[in-house]
Each structure stands twice: as structure tokens, then as C-alpha cells.
């Protein structure tokens, strides 16, 4: 614990210094748990990113319906995550730094009675300081992280001994949690939160003119992947003239660079952020929070991060929308679902612009069948209501009065 305290103190100093230099004083107050709190006892729910929070939404909504007596407070590591939670009508704050005195202030101010963390967000001061049960949903523990934990000696076992319920997102993670010290009676069902994704029933007038059978999406792309996507689009379009590309970069701030790249290849670009109609060669989806719209508009989806050494992004959301899936070789973040998809012929692996173009053309006549197969294959084995029933039972048993 001494080593962890030293490292977190150094990290906190860096974070606080950046906030002060950037004059982000509102963020600074939030990171120190100095902001206003709402009255009453709370269940503290933490999700690191927008993606984790969005994946948790079915669980959150089911929890709000099943347990109206439980007031929620949500924390995230980004202001966009906070804004997303607030748009759902939830009190949300930037996550407090994991320093003992800061965590104690947050727990006291919000009168926290239990803590529910998403995925790998296992912070020692939160886990050890929470007065009630600590639950983990969608826990992920890679082999690399499990090895790193050993650097902290007995801290990992102290933390895991305080976990009252943990639902791992895959069997490998569960085995590693148990080997690291998770009590056997705390092991919940194996469920990937992202599998709970239920596509919203959305309509967008701007996209309604696109023919889904002749539209493909390069989703959550990273630098280098746009080059591949644009080159593949040019090659495939020569044989499928109606083909349209929606290009949705992981970081919309890179939009100007992507426009220049496309123009250099002789492609015209329409930008979503400027309200332009998707009648150009490429429709640049340079906005945040609208990926569900783009999944619904495309019959074929290339999943970004799989060619850029990023481990790949989620296959669950495009699969739930019934899209035929294409991915590169780096799928380590979702190794198990991609293996199932590939084995069933519900996804196609590529490694270059040439193989991406070939996949786009080969998948066109069977994209609907592939999309239906992907949707069926990744359908969750347990719904959000069943998970909430398990969580609620633990809260009823363990939460102090």
C-alpha cells in the first residue's frame, strides 16, 4: 500500500498541476471532491469513459426501475462522460482522485452506502474506504495486468477480499481474479456489459437518403486507418459505383487532417459537424455520441483500432445493429467475441487496404445474412434485469442501515 500511495501522490500532483496551469478550477474542485453534493444516501457508480458509461446504460436504467429507493451518483474520468450521465437525468461528477483524504470527503459528502464500478476500475481507496458493499460489473483482468498487480504485494488480495460481488466480462478474467484472491462466493455471472447494448430506435433525416445496402462505415478509426479506408473505398467503388463511405474517426478533432487526406486522393467530403448533406464521396462523421446512427445506416462496418495497434473497439454495437463486420488483426481488447464471430463466418479479417476492398466487395451480397448471424451470436446470455436482481440482492443483504 505504501508503494501505491507514493505513486498516486505523484500522479495526483501531475494532474492537479495541469488543472491549475490550464485554469480548469471547476475540474480541480471536482477532482478534490469539493463540489456540491445532493442530500440522502447514494450508490456510487463509476465508469471511466464514455464507452463504459454507454455500455452500462441498460444496467443503469434497469437499476433505476428496479430500485427507485437507491439514489445514484455517477463519476467519470472525463467531462464528456459527466455530460452524458447528466443528459440521462443523473447527478454526475468528475471522479475524485484516489487519495485517501479526497475519497473520504467524497464518501462523506454523498453519504455513499455502496460502490458499483464498471470494468477494470478498481481503485484502492474507494474499495477499502467504502462503508458498504463494493461491486464490480464487467470486470476485466488481462494477463499483463495480473502480472503488474504482483508488484503491489498483498494489496491486490486486500482489495479483492473487500469485493462482495464481481461479474467478469470473460472466463479468463474471472479465473485470474479468483487466482489473485477474489472470494469464490463473490463471483457473479460472466457477462460483457457491451453485450447488453440495445440499439435505440432512432431516425435521422440527414442519413435517411443513404441506401444501407450500399453504405459502409469505418467506425472509431485511428491515425493510419483512415488512409487504409479511403484507399479501399476507391478500389471497391470502381466495382460497386453506388458504394458510399461514412468515416467516423475515434477523435473528431482530427477531422481537418482527414479532409485533407481525402481531398488529396480526389475524394469530396461532407462533414456532419457542419450540417452538410451526405452527398459527397465521403461523409465525415466528426461528432460525438452519434455512433448508433451511423451503425444503423451502414450494412458493412470496419471496426477501428484493429489495424492501428489499439486492440480494437467493440463489435457488440454494430453486431446488434445487424451489420456485417470487418476487422484487422489486433483484436486483443475483444479477443473472445471476435474469435466466435470469425469461427461462425459472421466477421471477416483483413490486414491491408487491398484486403479491405476485397472484403467490402465479397460481403456485399451476403451482408444481411452475416449481420443477422453476428447479432444472434453476440446476443447476451443474461439481460440487464437479471443482473440487477443479483446486484439488488447483494445490496439488500450487505448494505448497512
Task: Kindly label every feature range from the protein language model.
Residues 58, 62, 75-78, 224-291:
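Donor-nucleotide binding loops and adjacent catalytic segments primarily
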Residues 126, 225, 290, 313-314, ...:
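Conserved sugar-transfer catalytic core signal across GT-A, GT-B, and GT-C glycosyltransferases
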Residues 1-28:
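A transmembrane-helix-recognition feature enriched in membrane-embedded lipid enzymes
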Residues 380-401:
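C-terminal alpha-helical cap of glycosyltransferases
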Residues 110-114, 279-310:
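Acidic donor-binding loop of glycosyltransferase active sites
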Residues 39-44, 211-216, 226-228, 242-244:
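Charged active-site motifs of nucleotide-sugar-dependent glycosyltransferases
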Residues 19-32, 36-202, 221-223, 236-241, ...:
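Active-site and donor-binding regions of nucleotide-sugar-utilizing enzymes
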Residues 163, 296-368, 377:
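Catalytic binding pocket for nucleotide-activated donors in carbohydrate/polymer assembly enzymes
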Amino acid at each position: 500500500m505504501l508503494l501505491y500511495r507514493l505513486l498516486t501522490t505523484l500522479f495526483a500532483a501531475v494532474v492537479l498541476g495541469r488543472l491549475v496551469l490550464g485554469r480548469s478550477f471547476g475540474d480541480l474542485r471536482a477532482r478534490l471532491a469539493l463540489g456540491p453534493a445532493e442530500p440522502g444516501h447514494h450508490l456510487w457508480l463509476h465508469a471511466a469513459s464514455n464507452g463504459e458509461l454507454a455500455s452500462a446504460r441498460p444496467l443503469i436504467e434497469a437499476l433505476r426501475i428496479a430500485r427507485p429507493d437507491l439514489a445514484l451518483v455517477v463519476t467519470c474520468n472525463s467531462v464528456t462522460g459527466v455530460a452524458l450521465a447528466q443528459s440521462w437525468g443523473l447527478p454526475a461528477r468528475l471522479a475524485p482522485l484516489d487519495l485517501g483524504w479526497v475519497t473520504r470527503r467524497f464518501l462523506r459528502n454523498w453519504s455513499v452506502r455502496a460502490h458499483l464500478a464498471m470494468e477494470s476500475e478498481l481503485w484502492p481507496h474507494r474499495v477499502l474506504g467504502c462503508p458498504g458493499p463494493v461491486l464490480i460489473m464487467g470486470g476485466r483482468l488481462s494477463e499483463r495486468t495480473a502480472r503488474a498487480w504482483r508488484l503491489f504485494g498483498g494489496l491486490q488480495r486486500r482489495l479483492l477480499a473487500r469485493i462482495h460481488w464481481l461479474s467478469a466480462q470473460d472466463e479468463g478474467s474471472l479465473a485470474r481474479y479468483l487466482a489473485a484472491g477474489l472470494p469464490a462466493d463473490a463471483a457473479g455471472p460472466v457477462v460483457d456489459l457491451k453485450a447488453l447494448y440495445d440499439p435505440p430506435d432512432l431516425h435521422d433525416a440527414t442519413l435517411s437518403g443513404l441506401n444501407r445496402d450500399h453504405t459502409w462505415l469505418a467506425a472509431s478509426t485511428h491515425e493510419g486507418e483512415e488512409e487504409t479506408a479511403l484507399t479501399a473505398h476507391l478500389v471497391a467503388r470502381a466495382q460497386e459505383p453506388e458504394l458510399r463511405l461514412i468515416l467516423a474517426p475515434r477523435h473528431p478533432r482530427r477531422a481537418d487532417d482527414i479532409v485533407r487526406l481525402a481531398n488529396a486522393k480526389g475524394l469530396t467530403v461532407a462533414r456532419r459537424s457542419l450540417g452538410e448533406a451526405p452527398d459527397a464521396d465521403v461523409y465525415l462523421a466528426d461528432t460525438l455520441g452519434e455512433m448508433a446512427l451511423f451503425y444503423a445506416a451502414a450494412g458493412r462496418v470496419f471496426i477501428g483500432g484493429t489495424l492501428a495497434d489499439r486492440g480494437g473497439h467493440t463489435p457488440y454495437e454494430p453486431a446488434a445493429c445487424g451489420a456485417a463486420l470487418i476487422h484487422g488483426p489486433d483484436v486483443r481488447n475483444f479477443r473472445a467475441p471476435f474469435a466466435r464471430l470469425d469461427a461462425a463466418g459472421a466477421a471477416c479479417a483483413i490486414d491491408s487496404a487491398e484486403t479491405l476492398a476485397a472484403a467490402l466487395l465479397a460481403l456485399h451480397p451476403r451482408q444481411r445474412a452475416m449481420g443477422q448471424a453476428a447479432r444472434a451470436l453476440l446476443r447476451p446470455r443474461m439481460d440487464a434485469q437479471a443482473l440487477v436482481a443479483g446486484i439488488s440482492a447483494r445490496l439488500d443483504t450487505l448494505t448497512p442501515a
